A protein has these predicted regions:
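FIC/Doc superfamily catalytic core
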Residues: 1-253
Length: 253
């Protein structure tokens, strides 16, 4: 229904804002700090509840209701663990950065510091850590799809590290996620680039009077393009912007 679509759209927008804010913080400070993580979660969840202060949080099997894992309950303990994680994230060591990312992700999800949004916050931390280590220039590697597709393995392996110290299988899972997501991302970027060229050619040939590279960029930056976007970027009147959009619609764009 419309309400659920609206809520999903808000979640996506919040995720985008949180990721870009994190990217800005890491780019400016060359650090990924506890206070940055708290700010990212606040943007994701649109509240300032912050780190868990009340006991009672458990991770349960969705089908049976069985408690699978009980994260740290004490506020001071959570703070201390996050401080330790902050040190590990930012201090150099001899471990490969991708393996470090797997370790950091497991530790963060095990601390489970927030009432809500731990999974999404953890996945943003993954991206920001790779940027911090110069493995990414911009935040374009989204592991969420792989993790959600392989959710059962994700939770099983998280727990097996806690109960059986099975780090190797967990690390291999994360490395596979990075590899598969990287290949899919390259394919997606190439597809977008090809489509952009096709749209550019179509507009320049069929609507040469309104064509500009800025116009094409607007269409790809904003899948739902509004009059205001054209007015601001192209410095044209609302009437002209409306005319442009109608002409684009008439040629099937």
């Amino acid at each position: 229904d419309i309400e659920s679509i609206t809520n999903e759209a808000k979640e996506v927008q919040n995720y985008k804002e949180a990721l870009l804010r994190g990217f800005s913080l890491v780019s400016d400070t060359k650090l990924l700090l506890k206070k940055h993580i708290i700010e990212i979660q606040e943007i994701l969840e649109q509240n300032d509840a912050g780190i868990r202060k009340q006991a009672g949080t458990n991770l349960k099997n969705a089908q049976t209701g069985e408690v699978i894992y009980t994260p740290p309950q004490d506020y001071e303990t959570i703070q201390e663990l996050l401080t330790n994680l902050e040190i590990y994230i930012n201090e150099p060591n001899d471990i490969d950065s991708l393996i470090n990312m797997a370790i950091i992700h497991h530790q963060f999800e095990s601390i489970h510091p927030f009432y809500d949004g731990n999974g999404r916050t953890g996945r943003i931390i993954n991206i920001l850590y790779l940027i911090l280590k110069d493995l990414l220039d911009i935040p374009v590697l989204y592991l969420s799809r792989y993790i959600i597709t392989h959710k059962a393995d994700y939770y099983r392996l998280l727990q097996e590290v806690r109960t059986e110290d099975k780090w190797e299988e967990w690390i291999l899972y994360i490395l596979e996620a990075v590899e598969q997501t990287s290949l899919e991302t390259i394919e997606l970027i190439n597809s977008i680039s090809d489509l952009m060229i096709k749209i550019q050619d179509k507009i320049s040939q069929e609507l040469p009077k309104i064509y500009s590279k800025d116009l094409v960029e607007i269409l790809f930056m904003h899948p739902y393009t509004k009059i205001d976007f054209l007015v601001d970027r192209l410095n044209i009147t609302r009437k002209t912007a409306s005319k442009y959009l109608n002409e684009l619609e008439n040629i099937g764009i």
